[in-house]
């Protein structure tokens, strides 16, 4: 298949040096490929500043000052627990971590979203169905519950771009995917010594 001078072979793009695909052409292809349905609206195709930077072609010049400023903006925008309490109920957190529903066109937006954490991480060691796109989080409580550790973990859940700008991890708090209570419960699932995450097989 050919698209504006690019040869697409089984997902591999071989682009001739003399050809480029204009960004407006890409936007037009994307816009024509999606149809708004229920909560899955066309607004999802609009990239924010971080997504634009992280979608730049490999090898494109990157301004480190811009990257640093974007990371700082994300860090400054993190909202910590309103009552200062980071940990909720690990049992509820286990349910959130194992629930993959939410934000799809077929999902009821009135029902709470799940975190779908197992799609990318190993958590409880006896769970065999987990992804490995992200690091294993088994034994996470070994890191302790110091204030810096609690704040770090909360920030990663709220908006991972505050630490890793081009991370694929969902921005659970910043995007309103999970509620504050759900985030507290996931925190407990990770950090409570009684949680299955922190038990040996």
Sequence positions of predicted segments:
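Bacterial N-terminal signal peptides that target proteins for export
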Residues: 1-8
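Post-cleavage N-terminal segment of exported redox proteins
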Residues: 14-103, 156, 189-201
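Extracytoplasmic electron-transfer domains, predominantly the class I c-type cytochrome c fold
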Residues: 25, 31, 35-41, 45, ...
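Generic anion/oxyanion-binding catalytic loop in active/binding sites
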Residues: 81-82, 106, 172-175
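Secretory-pathway/luminal and periplasmic proteins that interact with or process carbohydrate-rich
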Residues: 103-106, 126-130, 196
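Local sequence-structure signature of Cys/Sec-based thiol-disulfide redox active-site neighborhoods
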Residues: 106-115
